[in-house]
């Protein structure tokens, strides 16, 4: 949760001058529909829950298992897109979803045999996937009337506040984790948030949210490779 908090605080810190000093974005934020702003705030809270549970899951299970299960987000996005936004899902997409479900079940069964602690991590990862799906679906709706910059700023702002509140509730201090934690937070802000989540948010206006979520399915393989070399996880 410390890493996620630093990541979002860095993001808000870097984006605030853009919003404040850019007349177009400033006017858009001031004139934004209050209902959409509230939705964006809710989206930010769910994003904070996603980060909190995903990072917590890594304490209980492997990077590969956690990332693979988090990627079941595509299932919940597809179902939500179909049920709540009247979207259409192709046969190939449903096939991909089925394969994702089977893969996740295999991981869960393997972790169940490995011990209850691993299964706890899997449950946290699954909850993180559901929260990420809600964040994505709200983004699809909000992006119809907002630019990427203003939408993501509101979401990240409320996400950062939510993470700070969670940090206070947990009793953990905000400081004292060394310069490495600050640097990692900055790097995650630059590459995972501004060049990751923000690009996905941009795409939500032009592409199906199910497709956006499916594009993240390469994460487990990449994460597994890094985990093998950095943490000797197999």
What is each model feature region?
Residues 1, 62-63, 88-89, 147-148, ...:
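A helix-boundary/kink motif common to multi-pass secondary transporters
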Residues 17-42:
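Membrane-helix interface linkers and caps
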Residues 9-14, 69-83, 98-99, 158-162, ...:
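Alpha-helical transmembrane segments of compact multi-pass small-molecule transporters, enriched
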Residues 1, 12-15, 77-78, 97, ...:
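Transmembrane alpha-helical segments that form core, pore/gating elements
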Residues 15, 41, 80, 89-111, ...:
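Hydrophobic transmembrane alpha-helices of multi-pass small-molecule transport proteins
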Residues 67-70, 83-106, 118-122, 178-179, ...:
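Loop-to-transmembrane alpha-helix entry segments
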Residues 38-60, 80, 106, 123-138, ...:
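Hydrophobic alpha-helical transmembrane segments of multi-pass membrane transport proteins
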Residues 3, 7, 57, 69, ...:
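Hydrophobic/aromatic residues within transmembrane alpha-helices
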């Amino acid at each position: 949760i410390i890493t996620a908090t630093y990541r979002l605080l860095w993001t808000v810190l870097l984006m605030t001058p853009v919003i404040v000093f850019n007349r177009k974005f400033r006017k858009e934020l001031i004139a934004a529909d209050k209902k959409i702003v509230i939705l964006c705030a809710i989206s930010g809270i769910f994003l904070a829950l996603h980060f909190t549970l995903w990072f917590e899951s890594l304490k209980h299970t492997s990077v590969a298992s956690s990332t693979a299960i988090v990627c079941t987000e595509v299932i919940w996005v597809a179902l939500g897109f179909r049920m709540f936004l009247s979207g259409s899902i192709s046969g190939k997409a449903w096939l991909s979803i089925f394969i994702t479900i089977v893969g996740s079940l295999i991981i869960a069964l393997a972790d169940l045999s490995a011990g209850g602690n691993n299964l706890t991590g899997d449950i946290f990862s699954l909850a993180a996937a559901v929260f990420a799906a809600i964040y994505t679906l709200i983004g699809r709706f909000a992006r119809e009337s907002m630019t990427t910059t203003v939408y993501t700023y509101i979401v990240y702002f409320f996400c950062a506040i939510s993470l700070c509140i969670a940090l206070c509730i947990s009793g953990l201090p905000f400081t004292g984790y060394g310069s490495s934690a600050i640097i990692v937070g900055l790097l995650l802000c630059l590459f995972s948030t501004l060049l990751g989540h923000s690009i996905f948010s941009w795409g939500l206006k032009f592409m199906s949210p199910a497709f956006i979520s499916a594009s993240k399915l390469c994460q487990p393989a990449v994460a597994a490779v890094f985990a093998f070399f950095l943490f000797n996880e197999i």
